[in-house]
Amino acid sequence: MVNHKLLKLDPGLYLVATPLGSARDITLRALDILASADVLAAEDTRTARKLIEIHGVPLNGRRIIAYHDHSKASDRSRLLAHINNGLSVAYVSEAGTPLIADPGYQLVRDARESNLTVLAAPGPSACITALTVAGLPTNQFHFVGFLPPQQTARQKKLAELLPLNATLVLYESPKRLKALLSDIETIVENNRQVAVCRELTKKFEEVKVGTPSELLEHFELKAAKGEIVVLIEPGGSTEIDQSDLEAALLEAMDTLRIKDAADAVAGAFSMPRREIYQLALRLKKDSLTP
């Protein structure tokens, strides 16, 4: 069965998300673009070729051009020249969504500066997948990617990030995971919840949630392997003054509809939207009561 169809793509740069591990996680639109683009570029040409072969997408004489973090400005210029000449260019990173802790930023920046069309075929992302399954707050999150490998620099960066009232999303290698957990344990109170999400969407997927010390104990007994996403529970004070909350909500309701005011205040205070909406309705009712 052929899952792709050939399209007439307009000239432009098409950023195509690819599976993290399970080849079946690719979207039909991604297959259409990979089958139809005039030019194919990839962070890892071997991985891209394997994915294309799995899904029966014919190359039809097209070669896959390598583009990665070590590519030169001249490599970007050649890719963008294809677009200027009326061709479509599809780009994939090794896995997941291009630019999200993956190459592609400078390519997109140069394309935008040249007023070229840039489009995305969205799909898998390790960051979003980890947030989905870990059970930590998702109303506000801060994507960090990889921290510095050196301990001093890593601890300094963590000290800046850990007070944020947002779930932190980090990528880490298996060999540095225990060092990272140890640093977190050193800097924050040990009741802070951390999730280690390993090999997401793959056969040996594992999600462990606990305090830094609990996770250190777990990974002392069982060495971590594969691709790892680490999520850290939000910092900041969890004590919210009710009068401050109501004052902010009343102020927002002066200029916004109740639903929009509730959404804005819920985001600002990192609280459930439904709870804030119910409070807004009560405040509105009280204001109408003589």
Language model features: what each stretch is:
Residues 42, 120-123, 170, 196:
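General beta-strand structural signal in soluble alpha/beta enzymes
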Residues 34-40, 115-119, 167-168:
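Short active-site oxyanion
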Residues 2, 10, 88, 167, ...:
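A contiguous loop/helix-start segment that scaffolds small-molecule binding in enzyme catalytic cores
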Residues 12-16, 86-93, 141, 166-170, ...:
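Generic beta-sheet signal
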Residues 1-67:
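Glycine-rich, flexible N-terminal cofactor/catalytic loop recognition
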Residues 3, 106-164:
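Class I SAM-dependent methyltransferase SAM-binding "motif I" and its flanking Rossmann-like core
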Residues 99-114, 181, 185:
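Short Gly/Thr/Asp-enriched flexible loops that form oxyanion-binding sites at enzyme active sites
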Residues 66-73, 147-150:
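Conserved helicase motor
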